[in-house]
């Protein structure tokens, strides 16, 4: 068996085109374009790259994009004041504060300060809680993007045994909730899990998000399983690889996401979708 490659670049572009068409229709109907505020504190190079891709995506679909590049010396109080201003701004539907924040800032406090109806990253406890109670509003971008990929490839996950490797607040935990909502029997593995191999070998669907290159040997993958690799790891050679041993895993899986070009593009596509959703459902008067 050779796995079908799940093309995240293609699906993300489709999603962005759909959002762009809906924005165009809004403007033609005399409504305002959705607005996204992107806040970057400091000079972290990776964060600058991520923020740049988000701003470009905004422009591509016709959003109003407001950028706030703050110096590393910005205080927590100053950042909270900016968020207060953006919470009250009627032209802004989504507020994104790029993580990680500089040392000394309480990221939980900052994220909880964002209006839950403008929390387009889906990190606010209110939005995570809504998802856990099966009544989601704004959903965490990477897990939402993964569900979109599975849907667009008509992969029926209901009834599958899904194993999520990694329990972060950004991917692992909300991914577990998304898969429960989709009807999976879900196991979440983490650093205290005993016999990880046993769990992987039982899985019909594996989602790996640990940030360690080739962490999951391909031979562990069950024949015909669906493999979603969230990891993005840069080797000394400059090559990007995932958390799963791709070349071996693709000979056993039925579907697999590549790195790069799999899950990554879907995170930004989900952010764009969330911003339009927030505009249409919460802020259109």
Swiss-Prot record:
Residues spanning the signal sequence: none
Single GO cellular component term: cytosol
The keyword Amino-acid biosynthesis appears for this protein: yes
Keyword Oxidoreductase in record: yes
Binding site for NADP(+): 166-168, 232
GO molecular function: methenyltetrahydrofolate cyclohydrolase activity; methylenetetrahydrofolate dehydrogenase (NADP+) activity
Pathway(s): One-carbon metabolism; tetrahydrofolate interconversion
InterPro entries linked: Aminoacid_DH-like_N_sf, NAD(P)-bd_dom_sf, THF_DH/CycHdrlase, THF_DH/CycHdrlase_cat_dom, THF_DH/CycHdrlase_CS, THF_DH/CycHdrlase_NAD-bd_dom
EC assignment: 1.5.1.5, 3.5.4.9
This protein's UniProt keywords: Amino-acid biosynthesis, Histidine biosynthesis, Hydrolase, Methionine biosynthesis, Multifunctional enzyme, NADP, One-carbon metabolism, Oxidoreductase, Purine biosynthesis
Transmembrane segments: none
Catalytic reaction list: (6R)-5,10-methylene-5,6,7,8-tetrahydrofolate + NADP(+) = (6R)-5,10-methenyltetrahydrofolate + NADPH; (6R)-5,10-methenyltetrahydrofolate + H2O = (6R)-10-formyltetrahydrofolate + H(+)
GO term, biological process aspect, one: L-histidine biosynthetic process
Function (record text): Catalyzes the oxidation of 5,10-methylenetetrahydrofolate to 5,10-methenyltetrahydrofolate and then the hydrolysis of 5,10-methenyltetrahydrofolate to 10-formyltetrahydrofolate.
Family recorded in the similarity comment: Belongs to the tetrahydrofolate dehydrogenase/cyclohydrolase family.
Oligomer status and interactors: Homodimer.
HAMAP family xrefs: THF_DHG_CYH
Name this polypeptide is given: Bifunctional protein FolD
């Amino acid at each position: 068996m050779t796995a079908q490659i799940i093309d995240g670049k293609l699906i993300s572009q489709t999603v962005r085109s759909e959002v762009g068409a809906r924005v165009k229709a809004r403007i033609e109907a005399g409504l305002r374009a959705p607005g996204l505020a992107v806040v970057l504190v400091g000079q972290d190079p990776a964060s600058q790259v991520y923020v740049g891709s988000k701003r470009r995506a905004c422009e591509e679909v016709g959003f109003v994009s407001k950028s706030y590049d703050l110096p590393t010396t910005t205080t927590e109080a100053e950042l909270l004041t900016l968020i207060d201003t953006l919470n009250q701004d009627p032209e802004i539907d989504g507020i994104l504060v790029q993580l990680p924040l500089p040392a000394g800032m309480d990221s939980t406090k900052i994220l909880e300060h964002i209006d839950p109806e403008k929390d387009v990253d889906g990190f606010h406890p209110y939005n995570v809680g809504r998802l856990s109670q099966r009544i989601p509003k704004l959903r965490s971008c990477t897990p939402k993007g993964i569900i979109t990929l599975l849907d667009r490839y008509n992969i029926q996950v209901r009834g599958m045994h899904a194993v999520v490797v990694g329990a972060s607040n950004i991917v692992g935990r909300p991914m577990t909730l998304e898969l429960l909502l989709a009807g999976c029997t879900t196991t979440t593995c983490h650093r205290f899990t005993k016999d990880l191999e046993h769990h992987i070998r039982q899985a019909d669907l594996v989602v790996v998000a640990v940030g360690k290159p080739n962490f999951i040997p391909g031979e562990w993958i069950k024949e015909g399983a669906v493999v979603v690799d969230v990891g993005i790891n840069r080797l000394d050679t400059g090559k990007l690889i995932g958390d799963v041993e791709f070349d071996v895993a693709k000979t056993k899986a039925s579907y697999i996401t590549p790195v790069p070009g799999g899950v990554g593009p879907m995170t930004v596509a989900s952010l764009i979708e969330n911003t339009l959703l927030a505009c249409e459902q919460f802020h259109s008067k």
